[in-house]
Amino acid sequence: MEACNCIEPQWPADELLMKYQYISDFFIALAYFSIPLELIYFVKKSAVFPYRWVLVQFGAFIVLCGATHLINLWTFSMHSRTVAIVMTTAKVLTAVVSCATALMLVHIIPDLLSVKTRELFLKNKAAELDREMGLIRTQEETGRHVRMLTHEIRSTLDRHTILKTTLVELGRTLALEECALWMPTRTGLELQLSYTLRQQNPVGYTVPIHLPVINQVFSSNRALKISPNSPVARMRPLAGKHMPGEVVAVRVPLLHLSNFQINDWPELSTKRYALMVLMLPSDSARQWHVHELELVEVVADQVAVALSHAAILEESMRARDLLMEQNIALDLARREAETAIRARNDFLAVMNHEMRTPMHAIIALSSLLQETELTPEQRLMVETILKSSHLLATLINDVLDLSRLEDGSLQLEIATFNLHSVFREVHNLIKPVASVKKLSVSLNLAADLPVQAVGDEKRLMQIVLNVVGNAVKFSKEGSISITAFVAKSESLRDFRAPEFFPAQSDNHFYLRVQVKDSGSGINPQDIPKLFTKFAQTQSLATRNSGGSGLGLAICKRFVNLMEGHIWIESEGPGKGCTAIFIVKLGFAERSNESKLPFLTKVQANHVQTNFPGLKVLVMDDNGSVTKGLLVHLGCDVTTVSSIDEFLHVISQEHKVVFMDVCMPGIDGYELAVRIHEKFTKRHERPVLVALTGNIDKMTKENCMRVGMDGVILKPVSVDKMRSVLSELLEHRVLFEAM
């Protein structure tokens, strides 16, 4: 067949196909028109969509596409030219818009792809943030558990409660099957199972401390997983268990307490640790998480701190109990010492009274005998008796003074006195004794030495007299010099007494007294012994000179009371020595000079020798001795032995009454009060004088309180009684210094 170039004739229209095309174009147009509406709705709902103008192009493109399909509905049948023009116009517009949209997509698609990439990045970031939030929540949970456990641990300072609470709280928080604490033994060579979670009284298992697993844990500050078959993990029987739970162990430092020694703790010369072992439930798939291990590590550190605090508290309480026991023992010892001191003082007081009473008789009768006609041999014997008696009386006074100095009951009697007179009186007293040994005694008082001073005149004189007396005693020939002056600030300090810190003031001055002799001297190493009571050096001169060894010991204590210092210098035996002391005295006010409430000494030129006809009443347990003294002085003496007899005999004719206030069964103070009641007028009442052997300050104060006119200490010689009566008749008052 020859080929022909012909056009296939138009096939006849099929009604069914036309119908389907018609319906399809309608729905295509409907879809095209609905899509822009949906885009417009969602763009309005989105506030951040960045491609609104692109959607406008898409909307126009879709609308035009829908319009072509809609117009196409009229082209399936015969249609007019107008329909063809509209159809052509719609397709041209659709072509233009579609091309413009296609060109625009070239720029938009990369942005859209990057949006997807950003979406994936944001998803990854969100997942990472979720993980971090989970970690933060885990840390917060761990921190909450740590705070809770720390609060429970710190709620007590009992070591056993701390450890038991730790195991219980860890077991509850971490849902443990078992938790145990291994403590080092006292030797530090083993670990002993001390506390467990499930067992009330764990058996004291021990394991060597040098096991590899223990060394591994002790060498790290982290919680480490260990084998369930490890010796320190075998805390519970595994019978019937298919798979043991995971086990971790952590060290618990035992902090070094340098100032405390805990009784049941190991020796902490090197760093030591306890071991805490924690086991998860058996037959479970549970494993240890990082935050749980961190919780265990923090709790171990908190337990270490709490244990150190508890140990310190235990040792403090133990030290407190020990201190209380020591205080009780000290208090008991103090009371025993006070009882012993009171017993000693009572004994000394009784012995003082009992010794002075016979001493009074010996001295009184010896002094009476001395004034009678005696042969030279008899006079020598009487003088020896008197000297021995006076020495014994001095020894009694020294013992009592030392006793009161040691128990602190002796106090200085501060008053204004003539300082120059003290040295002159000592010089006058010592000069006759020195002249017998052919010793020259010189007194040098500095020009700037105050005449009046404030201090204890009696004790100062006692110090000077004792020091000068020692110089005379230990010197066979040569001279003795007494020098007194106001010490300058540069000469106050003595390198031998670093504890002596004198302080200068406008209200007081420091008196320096130096007594230098050319006597036997002393070894320098023996000088400290001189100030020890009852101690004597071994030199021949000392042994031959006698003495009780109390003089300088008492002087040192008196000097200390006066805030001073005393020392002795000597180059050796045969080279003499110098005694030096410094005492603190006050400057006297001119308005107070010589205004003393009573007199303590009597001028010799005013003493009467006899008192003929002077009526005296005596009540004394040694009444005959006292009466003998008074009768020898010419007095008319009446003696009584009871209160009733005393009150019956006493009258206005009696000028002086001597009464012993400490006679057995007689209260002398009450008797003095009754005498005052009987004689209401002062000029009618006789002079009341207490004659006593008690030298304590209380006796003197009691006598003054009940209105007595004087106190005289036994023993009394004829000369002393003569001076006493002379003073009483002249001033009607005399209180002998005590």
Swiss-Prot record:
Sequence positions bearing 4-aspartylphosphate: D660
Function: May act early in the ethylene signal transduction pathway, possibly as an ethylene receptor, or as a regulator of the pathway.
PTM text: Activation probably requires a transfer of a phosphate group between a His in the transmitter domain and an Asp of the receiver domain.
Family per record: Belongs to the ethylene receptor family.
Cofactor note text: Binds 1 copper ion per dimer.
Highest rank taxon of the organism: Eukaryota
Phosphohistidine carried by residues: H353
Chain residues that bind Cu cation: C65, H69
Top EC group: transferase
Domain GAF: from-to ranges: 158-307
Keyword match Protease: no
Annotated localization: Endoplasmic reticulum membrane
Transmembrane stretches, start-end: 23-43, 54-74, 92-112
Domain spans labelled Response regulatory: 612-729
Chief location of this protein within or outside the cell: endoplasmic reticulum
A biological-process GO annotation: negative regulation of ethylene-activated signaling pathway
Quaternary structure annotation from Swiss-Prot or TrEMBL: Homodimer; disulfide-linked.
Listed name of the protein: Ethylene receptor
CDD domains cross-referenced by the UniProt entry: HATPase_EvgS-ArcB-TorS-like, HisKA
Annotated GO CC locations: endoplasmic reticulum membrane
EC id: 2.7.13.3
Gene3D superfamilies tied to this protein: 1.10.287.130, 3.30.450.40, 3.40.50.2300, Histidine kinase-like ATPase, C-terminal domain
Organism annotation: Prunus persica
Pfam families assigned to the protein according to its UniProt record, in alphabetical order: ETR1_N, GAF, HATPase_c, HisKA, Response_reg
Topology term for the membrane: Multi-pass membrane protein
Taxonomic lineage: Eukaryota, Viridiplantae, Streptophyta, Embryophyta, Tracheophyta
InterPro entries per record: CheY-like_superfamily (IPR011006), ETR (IPR014525), GAF (IPR003018), GAF-like_dom_sf (IPR029016), HATPase_C_sf (IPR036890), His_kinase_dom (IPR005467), HisK_dim/P_dom (IPR003661), HisK_dim/P_sf (IPR036097)
